[in-house]
Amino acid sequence: MKYLIYLSLACSSIVVSAQEKSLQWQQVAAGVWKAVAGVPKKISPLSIANIQPNIEALSKLGKPAFPVNLQQSVNEIFDAKTLLRFPLEKEEQLFGLGLNFKSVQQRGTIKELQVDHYGGKDDGRTHAPVALYISDKGYGVLINAARRIKVYAGIAVRKDSKNPPEEMNRNTQSNWDPQPYSDAVEIVVPAPGTEIYVFAGSNALEVVQRYNLFCGGGVLPPKWGLGFTQRTPTLFSDKQVMEEVAAFESKGYPLSFIGLEPGWQTYSYPNNFVWDSTRFPQPQNFVRRLLDKNIRINLWINPYVSSRSPIYKNVLPYTGTHTVWAGVVPDLTLQPVQNLYKKLFLQQHLDIGVSGYKVDETDGYDVWLWPDGAKFPSGLGGEQMRQIYGLQFQKMSDQWFREKNQRTYGLTRASNAGSPSLPYVIYNDYYNHRDFI
């Protein structure tokens, strides 16, 4: 009898833990609702971006009702994962799910959303894998988790579906479909909790507007950020850069900012973040001469720290278990790390007139960056850190320029949800011109 009681308790525990629950939505702004499944981690893309919703502008867009077709959305915590399901209508179209190069319509696709170098496939591995899908029915769903989120966008079919596909005989029915009709978006978050946001609007454009405004609104770039730029070879000296500028002037070509590649530093890959005194003996004078011509300077960096960097010794206790190109990987979420970067970057760059950064290699490849099993002092694992690393550097550096009341406009290889208000654009090392067009 004792064993039967134990078995009964175990079975009831399984049933309760695996039971689907309706998502409970709370309105957080005009046309924006939030639900919580399980117990979310404190670190998420939106928390890293520290979004400040533009409540007034959101209200001006109107106050739409909660999307009726999402009222049947459910969640479940199972196998230490959060399972989410959102209904779809028969002809509903879906868009979004991060930066894609070859596809627009996403219904019928599977995406595993991970910050990574884009390798030629729209499979979710991309520079900005924002877990936001937009419906032509006038709503969008955002999953706010710093995880490798898997999305089955109208492709999975449950046996208890209220709108099941017709069973067909491939032997005799020529219209047999290898991908039967699916009436839901199913999402797997590899963590026992997440936040979910819904954005409503009269059309897809308004939904995107509402998402952008909820993240603080878009960026007003400096005029020079929209101008013509030129990046010089990695080992160019100050003299060679000035000769390049003179060549532009002699031909009457406009030039708004010059990008210096890794060789502006004494040591790169990993980096010391300090000007090379042989190629740039007087960096402040060099930057000033360019500013006098109304030309800005943008510096290439990646965040990985060489043992030859002035901050190496002090940052070492705040670094992860793994290295990148033998350089240590600081936990950028920690305040002491942010303070060390800020002090050095202000001294070496911003205080002498540098106007922005090109932030490289915060995306991938897997063979370059830390593994999922990496651990960081904040308690974040490798998977989580990879999802927010580029976003965190954007936020840090944006704050430096804001404190100087100076606009910046930079380039980044990695971003995520919450970034619309940050003054960076995506770039990459993917060179298939046809895919860009």
Each model region followed by its residue ranges:
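Bacterial Sec-dependent N-terminal signal peptides
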Residues: 1-22
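Catalytic-domain carbohydrate-binding cleft regions of carbohydrate-active enzymes
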Residues: 20-437
